[in-house]
Amino acid sequence: MPKLRFTRWASILLLLLAAEGLRAAPPEDYRFLSLTEAAEQAGEAGKPMLLYFGRYGCTTCRKMHAEVFTDPGLRERLNRDFVLAYVDTESGNRIRLANGERTTEMQYATRNRIFGTPTFVFFSPQQKPLFKKAGFQSIEQMKQYAEYIVEGHYEGMPLADFLSKQ
């Protein structure tokens, strides 16, 4: 009987460990923070913020991790010039918003009308949302979005005009 009990507990432990591995995660080698930490850090540093909404099982997210976020130039640009935040659109993890309100990542995504992943929301250094892009974005597109914000083009030109001149 003791052997059966050990086997049952070992099975439960393995299931819990496997379930932990099923959580959505941002790409490796990027300094993604929780939304709460990123908003604080961006405000203190006066840097723009990139908010990445993803979820476990998102095939387009995996494709971006493999084909886009592996680019060394993009990695360097985003890590250097942005504060990066990641929100799992299916997570019940609790977060605290800038106004002090507590909510879950899932509720925050729904409230912000994030219905597909990946979705990227770019914020100015003043923490104003500038634009949102849903779905697969190429390396070149992500670099153009970064340039548009970091070089201040958003202050005098719509994104579409900036992109048409590239």
Regions found by a protein language model. Give the residues of each.
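Sec/Tat signal peptide C-region and signal peptidase I cleavage site
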Residues: 20-25
